């Protein structure tokens, strides 16, 4: 454990010195490019904890530390992929990430849930309700694979819920994911929503609709 705490301290001091403007919500995840950042050493220390300790034997400090590292690894997503091989660890950290400040860990757990074959797939219903837009979007995509019978209902809800302002980035990308999920599950409502997409002034949504049409012709 001490190795993990030590590497996080070294990395955090480096990050505060070189990128003081970055935060949990404003983090591009490209820490692997940092010279002398100890990013890789920190990640290795996190993996060592996962491999050497049982998830039910660690305290909140360790859990918080692991979530911190997973969030920093949001560009490569290596640690969360390793966690898919450890059911208990994955489920523990996934649940702890819900609504936490570690938004860049939360969406990774939503995205990779299907790769953790023994994990409780119903966790996806928590992720899809996340207040963090990107987490909910990743969860909808994962739901298409894990719970296809539910995916159509959620995709349509995402399209129509009006959670984000009309014309916003968030609203457009929620609709893009909804459209792609309807296509993925071969929904009978796909054509209806392709027509809706064409009638909106969203450049990337229209482009996605055109690609979907081309793929099914």
Regions found by a protein language model. Give the residues of each.
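Amphipathic alpha-helical scaffolding segments comprising HEAT/armadillo-like alpha-solenoid repeats
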Residues: 50-64, 85-99, 117-129, 148-164, ...
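Alpha-helical scaffold domains
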Residues: 3-13, 17, 100, 104-105, ...
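Generic structural signal for well-ordered, non-membrane alpha-helices
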Residues: 9, 13, 44, 85-88
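A general structural signal for well-ordered secondary-structure junctions
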Residues: 14-17, 21, 76, 89, ...
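Extended amphipathic alpha-helical repeat scaffolds
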Residues: 1-40, 217
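Surface-exposed polar/charged interaction patches
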Residues: 14-17, 21, 52, 56, ...
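Structural detector for internal amphipathic alpha-helices that build alpha-solenoid repeat scaffolds
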Residues: 29-53, 64-85, 104-117, 136-149, ...
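Short inter-helical turns and helix N-cap capping residues of alpha-solenoid HEAT/ARM repeat scaffolds
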Residues: 101-102, 131-134, 162-163, 170-171, ...
């Amino acid at each position: 454990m001490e190795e993990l705490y030590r590497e996080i301290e070294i990395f955090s001091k480096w990050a505060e010195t070189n990128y003081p403007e970055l935060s949990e919500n404003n983090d591009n995840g490209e820490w692997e490019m940092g010279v002398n950042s100890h990013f890789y050493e920190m990640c290795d220390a996190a993996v060592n904890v996962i491999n050497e300790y049982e998830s039910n034997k660690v305290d909140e400090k360790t859990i918080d530390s692991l979530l911190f590292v997973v969030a920093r690894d949001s560009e490569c997503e290596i640690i969360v992929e390793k966690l898919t091989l450890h059911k208990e660890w994955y489920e523990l950290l996934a649940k702890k990430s819900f609504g936490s400040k570690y938004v860049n860990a939360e969406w990774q757990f939503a995205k990779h849930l299907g790769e953790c074959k023994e994990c409780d797939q119903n966790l996806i219903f928590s992720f899809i309700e996340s207040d963090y837009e990107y987490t909910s979007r990743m969860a909808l995509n994962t739901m298409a694979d894990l719970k296809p019978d539910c995916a159509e209902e959620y995709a349509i809800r995402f399209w129509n819920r009006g959670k984000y302002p009309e014309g916003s980035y968030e609203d457009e990308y929620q609709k893009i994911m909804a459209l792609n999920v309807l296509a993925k599950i071969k929904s009978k409502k796909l054509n209806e929503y392709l027509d809706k997409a064409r009638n909106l002034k969203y450049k990337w949504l229209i482009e996605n609709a055109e690609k979907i049409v081309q793929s099914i012709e």
